[in-house]
């Protein structure tokens, strides 16, 4: 009984260490200097294809111009979503779609056909929190759709802030 308890404690410590390292890594997206979102998505997807047997379908449409800060956060969210799909979902396939929305907005979807996220684990990991914080920093919405044994889809939607142009100023007479 003591040996079993120790084995469980060691495995729990190992799992927590892996999660902590992954979370710290997620704070700094692994992108090359000056790399845009499309290039980063291609590079990270290619790297993941080389290191896993999970087929990944990547579709990138026309993308709007994004600022450097927005790009960094989007790349970080993508990295975390892809990592989660590979490491935790036990997915048989992953589909990634990135495109412009209403010409200036951006939409990213990372969907897998894995085991989904159990209700009691939703929003409890460092990775999910990190993605949500990144989305909030750029004013984006992050939606996670999941159900046990039905996979998970992470959807990021971003639109640039709207700027109102004031009407003509009339001088008082």
What function would you assign to each model-found segment?
Residues 1-173:
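Coiled-coil dimerization/phosphotransfer module
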